[in-house]
């Protein structure tokens, strides 16, 4: 709000603090998407794979992953795109010795999985050198690529197959 010619910031105490056992604690802002992108020289080339739009900053994803108290979780990203989530999981495991896993899914539009996601994660695991000469050390991890597709079957075949499995 404005008081005279000066702009004043106004916030409700309940929005910026937390009451724990009768003590009032100030909440700290953890940052925004833009705080994380400003730290990165060129977000579009992260992981040594060119990707114009939609890459999520690794530092931001690592921060989100680290908020979960355990280090043996499986992180699911069903809009995988450039593979940022997988990159962040691998990097966070290297940083804190965790055993997290990830599952990345995509509809493979424009062959994105084969040409971007897989190559990026392979680069992260093997290590790479950027075109500017910056060296990224290998990060130990394993990577498997599966192609899943719809296979139409008749209802009768479906139940026969289900009986075989059971």
Where do the model's predicted regions map?
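Class I S-adenosyl-L-methionine
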Residues: 1-74
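Hydrophobic alpha-helical segments
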Residues: 91, 95, 158-163
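General structural signal for secondary-structure boundaries
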Residues: 1, 57, 149-150, 166
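Short, solvent-exposed loop/turn elements at domain surfaces
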Residues: 42-44, 154-157
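Short glycine/proline-enriched loop/turn "hinge" motifs that connect secondary-structure elements
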Residues: 23-28, 96, 136-138
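Conserved S-adenosyl-L-methionine
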Residues: 58-130
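Conserved phosphoryl-transfer catalytic core
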Residues: 104-156, 162-165
């Amino acid at each position: 709000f404005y008081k005279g010619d000066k702009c004043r910031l106004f916030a409700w105490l309940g929005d910026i603090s937390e009451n724990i056992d009768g003590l009032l604690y100030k909440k700290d802002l953890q940052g925004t998407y833009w705080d994380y992108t400003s730290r990165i020289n060129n977000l579009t080339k992260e992981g040594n794979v060119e990707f114009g739009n939609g890459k999520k900053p690794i530092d931001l994803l690592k921060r989100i992953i680290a908020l979960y108290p355990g280090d043996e979780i499986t992180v699911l990203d069903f809009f995988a795109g450039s593979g940022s989530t997988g990159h962040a999981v691998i990097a966070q495991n290297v940083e804190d010795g965790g055993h997290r896993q990830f599952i990345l899914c995509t509809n493979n539009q424009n062959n994105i999985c084969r040409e971007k996601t897989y190559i990026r994660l392979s680069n992260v695991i093997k290590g790479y050198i950027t075109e500017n000469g910056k060296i990224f050390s290998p990060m130990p991890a394993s990577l498997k690529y599966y192609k899943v597709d719809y296979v139409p079957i008749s209802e009768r075949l479906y139940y026969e197959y289900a009986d075989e499995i059971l």
